[in-house]
A protein has these predicted regions:
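Substrate-binding clefts and catalytic carboxylate motifs of secreted carbohydrate-active enzymes
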Residues: 1-147, 159-160
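Short flexible loop/turn segments that cap and initiate beta-strands
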Residues: 60-62, 68-70, 74-83, 121-123, ...
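Short, hydrophobic beta-strand segments
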Residues: 96-103, 199-221
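Short, conserved beta-strand segments of beta-strand-rich sandwich/propeller modules, principally
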Residues: 105-109, 151, 226-228
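Short beta-strand elements
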Residues: 120-129, 236-246
Length: 246
């Protein structure tokens, strides 16, 4: 336990805190530092952290940017926070950092240049409270062989449709039609909710983590037709999506 605490991990945990994607395959912030370094040809910029910190109003909150460009200007609510350029040192070789940004709700925007020319932008905005759910399957058609899967991403969103990054609402999934819930996940290494569904229950529950969760649908062998997946959460507008089994 002591060693885990030294590494910054809470225990018990079902997985490591390291890596560039979580248990669901959702990209962590660190994903983008590797993308920027390994794919310098891809125009990209990524701001971190998110900008939902009501308890930090007026406090210094450093902002980092991962980018394949070589210099960037950061704006908070339209006001420039200065320009940063990549260097050769350990600190500024892979990221650009604004150490003295004071948290104010609103919008962070970074404008990146490469070789003096416009390259990429990124924006993060303070969101409202959770208001609705959305579902997005990675595949809308799967084979009826009893093995094919559709991974469905669940997002908690505010009234303007923006994903709420700190939300952890309890989610309930219900499926009907020629497919079963193969498993659920939220990417939280400290959440020990059962992910697998060996009994093929048509209802499962899990909390959102950082505004996201995932449900995996598996086709039934020899069956075809339309599968309906619903997700509900107390106080939020529910969501529904369909997947076709052929």
């Amino acid at each position: 336990m002591a060693e885990l605490k030294k590494l910054g991990n809470r225990a018990p945990s079902r997985s490591s805190y390291f890596g560039i994607v979580d248990l669901c395959g959702f990209k962590k912030d660190r994903f983008y530092i590797y993308q920027a370094h390994w794919r310098p040809d891809v125009k990209m910029a990524h701001i971190l952290p998110h900008w939902n910190w009501p308890e930090r109003k007026g406090q210094v909150t450093p902002v980092h940017v991962y980018t394949s460009g070589d210099e960037a200007e950061l704006f908070l609510n339209g006001k420039s926070q200065g320009v940063r350029k990549k260097g050769t040192g350990e600190k500024d070789r892979y990221r650009l950092v604004w150490e003295d940004v004071k948290y104010t709700p609103g919008t962070l925007k970074v404008v990146v240049k490469k070789d003096g020319k416009p390259w990429a932008t990124d924006t993060v905005t303070t969101t409202g409270k959770p208001a609705a759910l959305t579902l997005k399957p990675d595949r809308s058609e799967i084979k009826g062989d009893g093995y094919d899967l559709s991974y469905v991403t669940v997002a908690v969103r505010d009234a303007q449709g923006r994903m709420v990054p700190r939300s952890k609402n309890q989610l309930t999934f219900k499926v009907s039609g020629p497919a079963d819930i193969a498993g659920i996940c939220n990417g939280d290494p400290t959440d020990f909710t059962t992910m697998a569904n060996p009994e093929n229950k048509n209802i499962m529950k899990i909390k959102a983590f950082n505004g996201l969760a995932q449900v995996i649908l598996r086709s039934r062998k020899g069956e075809s037709g339309k599968v309906t997946l619903q997700v509900i959460s107390n106080g939020l507008k529910p969501a529904q999506t369909t997947v076709t089994v052929k």
